[in-house]
């Protein structure tokens, strides 16, 4: 039996089946079922309170919706593609349950404000989850940094050894990135926590609705102040996709480093077996597949952002069917981000850090060259002159196959009488790191200050 279209009064002919399938969205927008029912519950309570429909009718509709919500949460609802989308599927199921009175639910409402409301509710839930998971990830980074304040590793520029740094500082750099991500998602909430319900198709309604009431019932901060904006706004989704893209970029950067660190050439870390895979042909392989997948999925999230920006770029006010394309990218991004945060957190929490290997990699390089230049500058030599002297010495050492700490004291004295026997302490990677205590620097005192601030920030985040 063909499902009757709720909008069918205007039409003499029905859609062909293949056209209907092209236009239907129930395949993916069924993810909004819970939120669609929640929005309808708020709407029908308001309709009853304002006497737009009778209290008795409102109670019957409310009871039917509550039954549908229970059935949905139990996985018992079955949706029909002939009902196009989640809104018409829910209304059809409600009609089967309580009869024609279900038709009064849509009084003073359009699918335009209905779908916008559903997406605001969905994204609110998602934002809370993302921020909560980011707080956990930041906590793991802080805990790991606390363990490795005095773990020395090479700091890189251009992927070349630059200066020795504390591994804790490297981790805290990512902590800061994820903190900014949390702030962006929190700000995103301001534009998401607004109710479109009651805007109707675009121009509002002649019924004496109470939009503040429905907004409050759904837990929104306020209703939209302009009905045209309410049904056509997708900025809140674009902000989410943009913020998610930046977050994925940060996670991808860290994953790239983890991939390098667990390679044979680095051997800085070993990933847990629970976050690694093997090879079907090479029995020795232990591959960082999960880190690689996060890196790969980053491009997918970027694509979702560009996709929706492109959909929106020429849309006139207000609702256009193009906006059906706003959902799949949002759902995909939300699911990708949430699982990626969990995977990265798990990798960091279970990986083994090889402190000795990290430290050794700073001993057979020239990353202490800046220390020698700074040493000479601290003795009164102009830094540019010191830079020139050290550069030439590095060249000579490179040709001779040894390092700055191998140069004899006599040779140093010949280079400059300003150089004293304490030069060898200054060239030590650990000493070099410990002394850089400028604000935000890699020195141990500076790291302690950074950790203190980070712990306070996390405590505040957990108390919200």
From Swiss-Prot:
Cell division among keywords: no
Signal sequence, start to end: none
GO MF annotations, alphabetized: argininosuccinate lyase activity
Main location (coarse class): cytoplasm
Subcellular location: Cytoplasm
Pfam families registered for this protein in UniProt: ASL_C2 (PF14698), Lyase_1 (PF00206)
Entry-linked SUPFAM superfamilies: L-aspartase-like
GO terms under biological process: arginine biosynthetic process via ornithine; L-arginine biosynthetic process
Catalytic activity: 2-(N(omega)-L-arginino)succinate = fumarate + L-arginine
Top-level EC class as recorded in UniProt: lyase
GO cellular component term, pick one: cytosol
InterPro entries, sorted: Arg_succ_lyase_C (IPR029419), Argininosuccinate_lyase (IPR009049), Fumarase/histidase_N (IPR024083), Fumarate_lyase_CS (IPR020557), Fumarate_lyase_fam (IPR000362), Fumarate_lyase_N (IPR022761), L-Aspartase-like (IPR008948)
Keywords: Amino-acid biosynthesis, Arginine biosynthesis, Cytoplasm, Lyase
Enzyme Commission no: 4.3.2.1
Pathway: Amino-acid biosynthesis; L-arginine biosynthesis; L-arginine from L-ornithine and carbamoyl phosphate: step 3/3
UniProt record similarity statement: Belongs to the lyase 1 family. Argininosuccinate lyase subfamily.
Name of the protein this chain belongs to: Argininosuccinate lyase
Gene: argH
